[in-house]
């Protein structure tokens, strides 16, 4: 059988079969021994020439490429797993795979047909199997002998073995006959085998030797070197090897087409038909293939020349061959019809109309006219087996969906659907198809059940969609967190992809799904957080695009980062922290608006700052911008200078009262305000004010000025300007200034030369009063400057100026020398022989210290400098003490040095001395150094040496412990100091633990006064008690309560016995109590508290001022326990700052039992007065007790206030009982100490101080005493009878006196009730409240509002009244369109109005922010605020020169619009004032009320209205922005304010705002309102309505302009194809007429009608406005009908407002005549339909017609669930989900 091979396949040559006798005889003549010898020689030659063999293999490949395809050895198949008839082509031992070239080895084995087997079957058959499957012999003997020696050496050995009897049995891998060798008698292969030709050595290639046969097999000698072969497989089944007919293979890339008129697989013409017939009978057997032909493919069909393509002629050679379809030629030309019209002036319009008609005819050709036959696949009930088969078919991509769409198994829905898709691994697109099919049927079920009730249908559909979304969410959670299942990763990937596709196609409730994603991320555990981050990142853009989800997402990430970063196992979560840090950094740069949330930002700002990488300027810049935006929403409403001063003063007070000064504090203060000069002045005022006690403020100011000097601040000029403008009267203020300048001069940032020049320019110093101690600071400073730190020239200039003023320089130097000599003598330093001071008795160090305190700043600095030089110079080593640098350095010498420095107040020099003295090895001295640092922690922190000194002492502690010296005092002092040093909490805990261990093992210090003879001092009975305690300590670490109670009672009884004696044995029993406390500190403290309460109730006892300090110093009594006795309940122990002053009832009950013993007054004195030197305490213990006193004042202010209240009540009760003997508060010293204590407590809690001082009694002397005390707190120089009024209090109020004025004001207002009760019925006396209101009015008019800081603590009624008054006056000052401001106001008046508005705003800000959370709830947005906000927008729109485009908010106009516009350039100034001043002020005002969370309906309405105004302002500012007005920053503030407002807005109010804005298109508004646009929400259908008969009659006339004029058409309307067809606008299609106008003639139109057409256009415009209002009224009535009519084409969801229209024609589809093209019409339905009119002179015009069709738009509901790709099994013309008729679709020709 011969056939024409396919294209591209090489034709095989006929096989040559012959057997040569000489060859056989020659081959048989070879002996077996010769063959073996040749084989061995060949193997040796191969080993020696390996490189030559590689070249031979390359030659073999080149020769094999020339090998003919008809060879007996076809290439093996490349498929390694194919196994046909024992032939394993994947066997690596197959040498043919290695010998044949790659191009032949890679061919498909089925494409090579052997001549011996033309059926195309595989030629690899075994020896014993015949051609047709019958058993046959193995062939001739010669064939059995022809084989290779080894499979690995098939073509390399020339040896021929003649023994045919040693044939091994055939196996799969060990067969000697190659599997690809043909079974028939083969020809002589010597001429054809390239392998044999190459492998035969040259010595065997003789001329007379014929071509040899293939090599024979070697002898059956077992070869042990050959690797073992696997066992043979079982015998394969027989295969049909009969020949098969030749089939034409169609090219896969050839395009196919459908053969018309053929349904049975037959038909067609030419070779394509034959090819289709051949294809139908091919192996595929598909009936669908027979209906299609292959384009441009005409294979040889057996008969030569039966196709025109095979006939070569001149035409075919030149132009080629193509199948031309029969086309009927045109018999008539259009030239005669169009040529006349084209020659006219309107020829271009005519040509466009002609083309429009041609396009219309072309569009209607083949247009789809069949009705929609769409129907979703039905659901049927199937058995489980069939259902499983159907689902498996769905998972098989080879099975088309049309086959599966015949029926959907019932019951596959919701969870089952998703699980089956996951388990069957259904492709994603097919899984989505199944979900659509099921969802469509579910939704149609709702429509059938709820027919007639559209509301219930919509509600049911929404509920079903939400339930389906919940199923998807549960599915994702179940798959994601099933970590133990197999193929977990693949399942997770599948779930992610499926959910993402469902989300992308809108097959779920997107809002609910996004909310679930964010909520899950917020509440997830750390172990699940990475998975939720992955899910959130899939929908990253959609989440961040909306405020509703973006803010929550950012907050969740920050919260997780904060928690993990603070976790104790943070090292485990390092990868997660890195991921969160990267995400947060990306979010801050990409979407910073999501971090604008004041409440969240204040909480997580510091944590977020830690995740910023170093050097990333973009992220740091974004962080700073976000911080600034949040500060605008949480900081004070008024950032003017008074507010900045308050902030600075508040920050400065913290570093001297609450916590030590941090290193970054100066930089923080620098950023408080941009007015740096005002900042410096406020800092100097704070440093020199008498209302801030202590020395720490001087060093804090010095540290800050040093830092600011590096920022290019001229400190010298700032200080000189301050001294010139500030009048300092109090000596305390002057000393602080002199001290500060002295430190600045020592640091080198205050230039003395510039100061001297400044004095000279002012006239110098001529009056002696100028340099006296009470002289002005600017001149007295010259005498206070330390001379030892000045240069020689500066010193000479200073002395010259002072001499001119009469200052005695020599006397001053002599006094300094005398002070130093007395100090040398007191310290025991050697003096000169003739020194008279050293000959006398030395002064006590305390007396010298008092004189130093009274000396000038220059004298103090000189003495401190001399003492430092003495210590550093080693002069103390040669003193009589011989102590410095040795182990025996006495604490007395150190105490003397410390006393001098404390008197001189030179702590900067003292810090250097302490650093030097830390080299001492005496632990007592080191402990005293630690105590000194503890007492002045704030001072050394300001000097930035606190941590350094602590580190040195801590290292010295380890050295002392290693030396074995008693380190307990140093350990105790360091443990107490470590708790005060910032950042040393862990070290403090370790030191306290070491101290407890040390106390247990060494209960008595070696250096203690009772360490050696404590037991000997006790009596016998007391010694037994001590031994019992020692045994308990040695035996264990615990003690039962009964035993402790017994021992405690025994020790306390003995302690009370020696109480009044003042014996040293009090210390012994105190030590026993301390050792007893080690067993159970908690129970011991309870026993001690009970004993203190017992002591409080004793009628007769000794003073507690001697016993309590001793017990505290020993360690068995704590200061909080003593303060607990100031409460009625002893459980208040350790309550800390949570305690408040007692009520009047509780106070009276306590003092009734204590007024006789003065217990409360003594306890108060214990915390105020220093311990007497006559007590049993050592100097070191007294110093440490003073530290505890100072620490209690700072850490327990409220407990001290309770104590003060009880002491005053006790004092009042005693005076009421006429018990005036030895009242502690009657002493003047105690009153001064109480005044200083109150001065400190007022700065911490002014309200608590006022409540503590509200003690009223029958004795008027106490009231006067309290009033005088509060007056002295405010006015330090006030006399006995000084009275301060409310107006004076408000005038004295500033940033520094504010707490003291607050106390005075509260005390004055609290007496109002008693004043009213005591008033008689006579003339009415104004109350204190009325007086205060009048004083506030005067103060606000004078623009003095510094007192507003104390308003929040007033009574709620008073603050509410004041806030309302300030709010009303603030709103009246705002400009508006209804009440425009006068254009004639000058700038000074405008500035005054702005200042008043700022003052009123500051009052409201202070009241609202100071009232706490409850106050925020009371101060909410009210409608009047929104009205004024609207007025500002109206005025801004009125002043804008171009029309505003604030959608949804336009149309506003005020009564003052004309007045504002008539001012010329004045309205530009007003507009600038609004944008720069008034609008920012009002935004601050709204910010105060935006933090409230009001869930009520009126509150949501007000917030919604405010948001609408914000939206209008955002759009308005975008329009105003330009070179004249930069509104970007202001627009950003409004945007941030809107974000804060919308965060607390209810969901229904948000939807109403979106509806009012009519689908906002601005990106910022979409973000604010979280509006997610549905791309299918605004689709519209365009309907054409037929005109009435009267309308047709009105529009049937035509008119023409006068001859010679140019025809025109309606402006704004371009002629073109229209979708609306009028009744009389059909264009005739007849041709052949010679008149060009008759081709487009409109029958029935006359010239009169043309003239009336223009008039009709004007009437049409008037009627359109009426039709619009009617259509709006009818639209709501038609929605019900439209929803029912469009159920087959629509979807679910609410009907949106029309915004996008699908230009669709519905009327012409039902007219029955599609031959008439429609006339052009615009898309706007409000415009009139236009009609083309043909003029008699050849022109054309478009005129509006009343009879033309009117367009009406109705919403089109796009049903996403019905968008199925294969809805039915039968292909229809119009079976798509959306009706093709809506798009005027055409069929493909």
UniProtKB/Swiss-Prot annotation:
BP GO terms, sorted: positive regulation of transcription by RNA polymerase II
Biased segments, Basic and acidic residues type: 220-229
Family: Belongs to the Mediator complex subunit 12 family.
This protein's UniProt keywords: Activator, Nucleus, Repressor, Transcription, Transcription regulation
Biased composition (Low complexity): 25-66, 81-98, 271-288, 1592-1628, 1647-1656, 1707-1716
Biological role stated in the UniProt entry: Component of the srb8-11 complex. The srb8-11 complex is a regulatory module of the Mediator complex which is itself involved in regulation of basal and activated RNA polymerase II-dependent transcription. The srb8-11 complex may be involved in the transcriptional repression of a subset of genes regulated by Mediator. It may inhibit the association of the Mediator complex with RNA polymerase II to form the holoenzyme complex.
Protein name: Mediator of RNA polymerase II transcription subunit 12
Domain of life: Eukaryota
Subunit structure: Component of the srb8-11 complex, which itself associates with the Mediator complex.
Chief location category: nucleus
GO molecular function: transcription coactivator activity
Location(s), subcellular: Nucleus
Region annotated Disordered, chain positions: 1-138, 156-288, 1592-1656, 1707-1727
Compositional bias annotation for Polar residues: 107-124
Database matches in InterPro entries: Mediator_Med12
Keyword Nucleus applies: yes
Cellular component terms (Gene Ontology): mediator complex
Pfam families: ARM_SRB8 (PF25326), Med12 (PF09497)
